[in-house]
Amino acid sequence: MTTFSPREIVSELDRHIIGQHDAKRAVAIALRNRWRRQQLDESLRDEVMPKNILMIGPTGVGKTEISRRLAKLAGAPFIKVEATKFTEVGYVGRDVEQIIRDLVEIGIGLVREKKRAEVQAKAHQSAEERVLDALVGSTASPGTRESFRKKLRDGELDDKEIDIEVADSGSGMPGFEIPGMPGANIGVLNLSEMFGKAMGGRTKKVRTTVSKSYTDLVRDESDKLLDNEMIQREAVKSVENDGIVFLDEIDKIAARDGGMGAGVSREGVQRDLLPLVEGTTVSTKYGPVKTDHVLFIASGAFHVAKPSDLLPELQGRLPIRVELKPLTKEDFRRILTETEASLIRQYKALMATEELDLDFTDDAIDALADVAVHLNSSVENIGARRLQTVMERVLDEISFNAPDRGGSAVKIDQEYVKKHVGDLAADTDLSRYIL
């Protein structure tokens, strides 16, 4: 897991998300606390519970983006789920325990990648032997093998086609749940896996070039060197101690005032979430997984519902509240220019593929920010996503005609922006439908 300090985590998030300092700080502290807990001695470590976070803020201000960037930073099993996808236990749909099962799968993937990297050198050696077998046959004399090995290492044989045998990972047949046994997902795939192991594993013949064959062969050879049971044990431990679950759209499962019935995918889901957030044991096909130390970060826009509409017990289990602020004109300007993969940089790169050079002046960027702020205040506040609508509208004509204008340069200034979106932005009725 990551050993970044809170300041480093915040500065990493700053590269992609403008503003929202409070939310970044809360997330950075929570992530650092995971590392701090690991440094404690055994007796105290069990007592330190994660402080779950609730992020509240209008749509399009960076809640989901913070979670996406955090996933890359965490270096720990991390899963982002929408609360709206789940239904109460007993109804058709996914129950919330599936979150932990998916998290374990992610944990296994992480541990396997780490272990593969450790045996990379040995696996590469074995892969080279298999490529030589395919090139000269296993009965060739040592002298022939060595001369081909030299050519292989010099890259002279990279484009030569060879037939190799690689493990067949199955046809991806869907599994099915056994009623009354959640988590015991038995499928055709599992049965074929069982038979495959009994018969020494299934393989398939693939025709490929020497250079491309290495990826499959190295993976194949590394998997032979790995101990699957140890990987599963380590992954379950990693999920129990370092797992992070990001619950998006939590406000959509809050009960509205005056609504009739509990709502299959509303209050019922909240009730099912309670034990998960508090700490329970979930049965997975890799064994039981305790959720006592899994960190939950929930977020929601809370346009219609309020945080107080959530079940009181669930509110109590999300002790850290962070409010994200609506975006100002200056924020929009910075989003367009300062983020690492800003929209302007993206459009410039896209047009450069047609040999068209886009140049945005400072007043054009101001005008774009102005239009976005105006539309957000007069129509509906959708945050930074409004910029995409405005940019698409401004660059619509250029994008369409780009292939015919290759080799030229286009300057986009304030006049150009006003010409393309000014009239729409001014007419509120029109912009309700178009922007």
From Swiss-Prot:
Subcellular location(s) of the protein: Cytoplasm
Residue positions binding ATP: 18, 60-65, 248, 313, 385
Lineage top rank: taxon: Bacteria
Similarity comment: Belongs to the ClpX chaperone family. HslU subfamily.
GO molecular function: ATP binding; ATP hydrolysis activity; peptidase activity; proteasome-activating activity
Subunit-structure text: A double ring-shaped homohexamer of HslV is capped on each side by a ring-shaped HslU homohexamer. The assembly of the HslU/HslV complex is dependent on binding of ATP.
Source organism of the structure: Agrobacterium fabrum (strain C58 / ATCC 33970) (Agrobacterium tumefaciens (strain C58))
Described purpose of this protein according to its UniProt entry: ATPase subunit of a proteasome-like degradation complex; this subunit has chaperone activity. The binding of ATP and its subsequent hydrolysis by HslU are essential for unfolding of protein substrates subsequently hydrolyzed by HslV. HslU recognizes the N-terminal part of its protein substrates and unfolds these before they are guided to HslV for hydrolysis.
Disulfide bonds: none
CDD domains reported for this sequence: RecA-like_HslU (cd19498)
SMART domains (alphabetical): AAA, ClpB_D2-small
Gene name tied to this protein: hslU
Pfam name, any one: AAA_2
Biological process per Gene Ontology, one example term: proteolysis involved in protein catabolic process
UniProt KW keywords: ATP-binding, Chaperone, Cytoplasm, Nucleotide-binding
TM segment ranges: none
Protein known as: ATP-dependent protease ATPase subunit HslU
The keyword Oxidoreductase is assigned to this record: no
